[in-house]
C-alpha cells in the first residue's frame, strides 16, 4: 500500500499556514451552515409531457435550491397540469437568497470530526415502494473485501458497459492510507409508515417535506433488534451516526420531485425531532437512494461515500450559483461532482486537503 510519505507535500511555511486557515474555516462552517447534500446530476433527462411529447431537461443545484433547464438553457417549471414550461430565470443573487432561506441551513456539531469506527445502515421501504436489491448485495457493496460490478445499460439509445472494483469500506481504507476501516452493520429493509411522497415531496420552497421523519421512523422500527448503545463509540449520549438507504430513486439524479434528495443533517439538534433508543439520542444522520435513475440498476458507492464524508465532518466543495464562475474540482473531488464518476461506481479518492483535514496526512514544511 502507498505510504503517506509518498504523498507528502513540500510547501513553504506561508502555504502551510494558509492551509491551516482554510481547514479552520471549514471546521467552523460545520457549526453554522446547511445540511450537506450531493449535487444534482448534470446529464440530460428525457421527460415525457402529459400529451406524450418529450423534452430534454437538465437539473442544477442541490437539496437547498434546484431548478431545471432545457436544451437552450432556459429555466423550466412544472405547472399544476403536469407540463414543464419555460419560466423566468433567477439571478445569482436570487439563487443564493433561496439557498439561505432553506429550512435545512442550520446544522449543529459539537466537534468537527466524527471518525466513528462502527455505524448502522438501515434499508428502508415505503408503503408504495420497496427494495429490489437484496440486503446481501447492499452489504457487499458497503463492506465486501473483493466487491466488483459488471453490467451494461442503455441510455438515450446508446449502450454503456460499466465495470468497477471496491466496496465503500475499501474506499475509506484507501483514502485514509489504511487508518480508517469502518464497520458498517446493514439491517432491513424495514417499512416506514407512509408513501415516499409523504417524506420526499417538495414544499413551496422546493425542499423535501419530511425526510427526517423517515429517519426517526426507521430507527424506531429497528430498535427491538438493534442495540443502539454500541454505536455511541465516544459515549457522549448520542449515536455517532445513522445512515439510511431508501428504496427507489433519489431526486438528485432525476428521480422526481416526490423523491428524497440524498443529504446529511441533524435529526435532534437541527430538525428538532427527538428519537431516543437504548438510552441514546439519534442526531447526525445521512441518507441516499437505492436505485440509479439513469442506469436503472442500484446505485454505486459514489453517493454513499459523498454523504458518509459529511458524517465524518467534511463539507461540500461544489459550486452552487449555477453560473459557472466559481471553479471547483468537479469530477476530481468526492465532495463535488465526483460521486457520479463511472455512473457512481468509481468515485475519486480523497485529495491531500481532505486527508489533512481528517488527520490522515501531514504536509512536510520546507524550512
Give names to the regions the model predicted.
Residues 5-8, 28, 37:
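Short stretches within intrinsically disordered, low-complexity N-terminal or propeptide regions
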Residues 28, 43, 227-228, 327, ...:
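Hydrophobic alpha-helical context, especially transmembrane and signal-peptide helices
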Residues 20-27:
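Sec-dependent signal peptide hydrophobic core
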Residues 4-16:
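Short, Lys/Arg-enriched N-terminal segments with co-localized hydrophobic residues
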Residues 241-243, 247-367:
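Extracellular hydrolytic enzyme modules, especially secreted metalloproteases
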Residues 12-13, 22, 36-283:
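Zymogen propeptides/activation segments of proteases
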